[in-house]
């Protein structure tokens, strides 16, 4: 049942999400009726605290007044025209209204035409109303040059005694912009009135066609009229002509209607036939009044009317009196010019008659020429006198299109600052005007920097104006959104009596209209400007989304620094964010100024309906303006059919009567008023009984939960009578196994309807242990109780503004229920954990190192340490072998768990309480014989506890890892070369490497072959071979090589091979040449080819460094050369002599005789035996 009750309670509530403008109950001005709203603002009379909604309107038949004041009457907005506001004649092109505690200033830009001016003028008329909206002063700027005083005082830069005047906290502006201008259709009568207001100039030419004029002179008169009309048509687009010829008869050659066709009118002039006879000048002038300047012949009531009389003599036989015609009522307002041709006008009577025809003064209206050929010399002078040439096509414009009052600020009870955006060819400027003296001083950039006049042209300076309250001074600023096509903000600076605008901030994107809207903000409401918001509503990303730049003002020198950039919802293009901005006062009720920014085209063209436009609310903080909006109000959520929602806005005053600041937002044709919602800030408290849990406690805990409003207002009290506070309790937050819980789940989710004693609400709750023992594992850490809360209100309740919790205060509070601890009557037990660790070695060689030992000594020299834990982080290539633990305290460790690239082993030391004691632990790891990817790794020991004031001890050891390998070079060997067996020898030098390389260590084999000895090239390397494809070899010529410095060698051939395998044979084939080297061989007996293994010792460890060097020695063998012929001859001669001597001695001894006889006997015996054998064979 309680669950159903809770769900029903929640379902009947509407969550209050928007902070903190109430969009559920807006008020709108009547749609389709008077007035048609262009802009709106709120104004309050300080003397009576009466607040009105002021709206501006275009000039129509239904809304004749440009300003209306509106009030809330029985939940409806009723509007009435503000009386005694002068309405200037002409077509209204814009209305600007600003207010301060000094009053209200309304300026109307009016399109008018001066008499005989060739072009229209767009200037302003301003009316200053008092705080009670009674008229105080009026200023008309049609003749601005006569109102200027270049020596008028400018107060900027001086200390200003009253900072309230013109301050950003009580000045709100609203003005109609061209981009959103869409006036109601006007009645036909009004259109006719406006046409007459721009009716132009009507010129009636009266030509003397009497008989006293010769035909050639009459033709010259017609040519003069043609040239005059053609000359005027080129400059004056609104000039119309009529031509009347007089003599014996008076006839209209063509009237004002016919002159619309320029070429036809010029042709008619040339086709005129002279009528002759008498000179009826007075009758001809009366004819123009009766038959030309009438509406039936194309004349407009408010057009400027001019007569040009061309005659060759005095009046003759005219029935009408000239004086009577001149003084007739129809002649009033008609300017007359007279041209007398001929000698007759030298007489006094005829001259007086000519002056009577012309208007005063005669110097500029009566002309005399001696003959008709001299008429063309009068054209330029006549044109200048008839039509004022200032402001004509091609000429520079000064104040004709100034639009005085396009933007405005009230400075005090007599001075105003008015933007003149169109002055000086739209370079713009500002007018500092004194409403009492009716004098002003024009301020612009051109006067200050004539060299930069080209950049100033068309910059629209004065599009927006504002006043900054700097430290003990005022500063006038003006926006120029087209300055150098990027836009800029100008600040008025003084040098002596000179004052001019100079740029201080410039836009960053072409066409962004940077500076079109300025909004000074006094965040802390101390009277000094803290920030300046500068809008660039056409800033382009995908479309013209717009953005706002927030600049901070320096308190020291008043300089600007960019604080942040604001932008609207990224999903909308062409939103024009920043089109309007306003400081809204303290909407969030934190004594800080809030700001509203409009995006009137956001959602334009969307499919969800005809409403479009949004307003963003940004709250002020002590360190500045918030970076994100607290609320986005869309037109579609307010009312259907609202267009350009956010084109103007203002706030800061209470029109609804609830004591809170309200705001108004302008849309096309209507104004919307929103009330702000009371902001509630709650102070939450919680009391526990018992205040601390004893060890082994198994009872219930009484909880007293109270909510107290820290800031009570009438609106908040009224709203809280109907609001509900929904709160939720989360007991033992952050614990996987909770030790306490609510005795009844319903008591942890409450719908509270009544507040006790107005500002405080309390509730009693019960907490009880969960199933099992209350203190099974964690009996020492506090039990955290989190209270989350929110305000809710019944749906459809709009009688009072709905309260809302402060957006910037977390809607929850956390309270701690501690356990009792034996800590010498102190609130917290403070343990003092000390950790000391050592490792058996810092450098480990994979493949060589077998074990690593870490000794850990943990000491608690303080009070009890609860739930003491030790975390041991070590690299994965260390495998736990054994762990030596003391018998006391008890240490229990979990199995290591892989986390990322390490293993973590968690140990519980002396759980639950580690008393004052020490523990020594030894951890032994075995190093895996696998390649380790990193050069270093850390072993980290971290010890923590669960005391309220946690203790933390940790130590880290960094291990250096290298990988071992075995590489053996073949033993040194000797080779022999017989240098006497030819001039060159081909040799191959083999370097054999073998060993064990389990971890893919890369090492280098360097072979050094001496090639040049004493400047002679002895050895040339021909070829290099290797057996492994992975081996990469390079070679170069070096002057020194390897580890040995061998004498006589000047150059080496160095071969470097990178090897990563177990075995490799590298063979270097070379050619040894001895040509021209006989002298060298006298001193050089051998060559040494060197071989050496090297490697990166920071990565690898060579396990047999004694076998990393070898050499191959080449020994040279040398043969002696002898002259053999003399020795042979001498030996032969000596031998013969010795033989002869021996023979002589033997002969004398009879040696040869006995021997010879024996030989002969043996020969005879052999012959006989042979013969006997032959005979036997034959037989």
Curated annotation (Swiss-Prot):
**Which PROSITE patterns does the record match to this protein?**
FG_GAP (PS51470), INTEGRIN_ALPHA (PS00242), VWFA (PS50234)
Here the segments flagged for biased composition (Acidic residues) are: 182-200
Q: Which intervals of the chain are annotated as region X-domain (extra domain)?
A: 145-199
Q: Enumerate the residues binding Ca(2+) 2.
A: 586, 588, 590, 594
Reported effect, residue 316 to A: Loss of E-cadherin binding
> Which range is the signal sequence, renumbered to this chain?
1-18
| Extracellular face residues | 19-1124
Q: Name one GO molecular function term.
A: metal ion binding
Glycosylation positions in this chain: 49, 271, 321, 444, 726, 782, 857, 934, 954, 1065, 1096
Q: Which Gene Ontology terms describe the biological processes this protein takes part in?
A: cell adhesion mediated by integrin; cell-cell adhesion; integrin-mediated signaling pathway
**InterPro entries for the chain:** FG-GAP, Int_alpha_beta-p, Integrin_alpha, Integrin_alpha_C_CS, Integrin_alpha_Ig-like_2, Integrin_alpha_N, Integrin_dom_sf, VWF_A
Binding sites annotated in the UniProt record for Ca(2+) 1: 522, 524, 526, 530
Q: Where does Ca(2+) 3 bind?
A: 654, 656, 658, 662
Query: Which family is this sequence assigned to?
Result: Belongs to the integrin alpha chain family.
Its quaternary organisation is:
Heterodimer of an alpha and a beta subunit. The alpha subunit is composed of a heavy and a light chains linked by a disulfide bond. Alpha-E associates with beta-7.
| Record text about domains | The integrin I-domain (insert) is a VWFA domain. Integrins with I-domains do not undergo protease cleavage.
- Would you tell me the protein name for this molecule? Integrin alpha-E
Origin organism is Homo sapiens
